[in-house]
Amino acid sequence: MSFVPTKVFFTKGVGRHKEYLSSFELALRDAKIEKCNLVTVSSIFPPKCERISVEEGIKLLTPGQITFAVMARNSTNEYNRLMAASIGVAIPADDTQYGYLSEHHPFGEDEEQSGEYAEDLAATMLATTLGIEFDPNKDWDEREGIYKMSGKIINSYNITQSAEGENGLWTTVISCAVLLP
């Protein structure tokens, strides 16, 4: 049986609770995907896959449904510890080719830093598969320009959730690309 997703939506959430597992559940609720049995998959953005809104995507979910997702997840119970969970996205100009989704789950990075890093990861993975020449030592802004000017990468972006740990509680952050039939 072959299953290639035709739709994707991006969501994120944060949860806090005295129990680790419950903080994850609350992050799933915040992201509006708690009713699914999530199966994490690796990082390919399928050819011809349409991005839809969270609201549209939620309507397509059924409680208990086996749902595939690329998920970045991070947790801490340390007071004031900054963490993030980011999904980076890179989409080729040719929609018959696949793109990339990257996961990044750091400590000590805010949303902007983490998101930019995840986006860079996805775009660099795509650039290397497309044969785009670039200097890996250049900063992201320079490489982003090279990638997009090549005409082979049409878009890159990220979805990121960050939070700081609260005293006495587990804090969990998630970012997900939810893949649908």
Swiss-Prot record:
Query: What Pfam families does the database record attribute to this sequence?
Result: PvlArgDC
Could you tell me one molecular function GO term of this UniProt entry? Answer: arginine decarboxylase activity
Question: Site positions for Cleavage (non-hydrolytic), renumbered to this chain?
Answer: 42-43
Cofactors: pyruvate
According to its UniProt record, which reaction does this protein catalyse? Answer: L-arginine + H(+) = agmatine + CO2
Per the record, residues carrying Pyruvic acid (Ser) are 43
| Keywords of the record | Decarboxylase, Lyase, Pyruvate
Kindly report, in one word, the top-level EC class recorded for this enzyme. Answer: lyase
GO BP annotations of the record are: arginine catabolic process
Task: Output the superkingdom of the source species.
Answer: Bacteria
Record text on cofactor binding:
Binds 1 pyruvoyl group covalently per subunit.
The EC number(s) attached to this protein equal 4.1.1.19
Family recorded in the similarity comment: Belongs to the PdaD family.
Q: What is this protein called?
A: Probable pyruvoyl-dependent arginine decarboxylase
